[in-house]
Swiss-Prot record:
NCBIfam families linked: L21
Name listed for the protein in its UniProt record: Large ribosomal subunit protein bL21
Domain of life: Bacteria
Keywords for this protein: Ribonucleoprotein, Ribosomal protein, RNA-binding, rRNA-binding
Molecular-function annotations in GO: rRNA binding; structural constituent of ribosome
Subunit structure: Part of the 50S ribosomal subunit. Contacts protein L20.
Record lineage: Bacteria, Bacillati, Actinomycetota, Actinomycetes, Mycobacteriales
A single GO BP: translation
Family indicated by similarity: Belongs to the bacterial ribosomal protein bL21 family.
GO cellular component: cytoplasm; ribonucleoprotein complex; ribosome
Coiled-coil residues: none
InterPro entries referenced in this protein's UniProt entry, alphabetically: bL21-like, bL21-like_sf, Ribosomal_bL21, Ribosomal_bL21_CS
Transmembrane segments: none
Summary of the function given for this chain in its UniProt record: This protein binds to 23S rRNA in the presence of protein L20.
């Protein structure tokens, strides 16, 4: 079984392993810089670690590959019988991370 971890960033949790490319909420750092992510769970073969004291010693490091945007989301609000229409669009800013190590 492979080693993987559950990391928390941007209010979400992601399952990552070494070498994975993960799209996460935007992180304010330059591409090429290294970041450390907080760990919620580590699985190493048959061993599952959830103890907060042991997880404090575990570090998941990653390298920022690029900043990008997610797909276009279209919002349309409509009120009946009043002529109210509101169209709005949104593209979430994302960061592509390459996981370099789980130690």
């Amino acid at each position: 079984m492979a080693t993987y971890a559950i990391v928390k960033t941007g209010g979400k949790q992601y399952k990552v392993a070494v070498g994975d490319l993960v799209k996460v909420e935007k992180i304010d750092s330059e591409p090429g810089s290294s970041v450390q992510l907080p760990v919620a769970l580590v699985v190493d073969g048959a061993t599952v670690t959830t103890d907060a004291d042991k997880l404090a010693k575990v570090a998941v490091t990653g390298e920022i590959v690029e900043h990008t945007k997610g797909p276009k989301i279209r919002i349309h609000k409509f009120k009946n019988k009043t002529g109210y229409h509101k169209r709005q669009g949104h593209r979430q800013r994302l960061t592509v991370l390459k996981v370099t190590g789980i130690k």
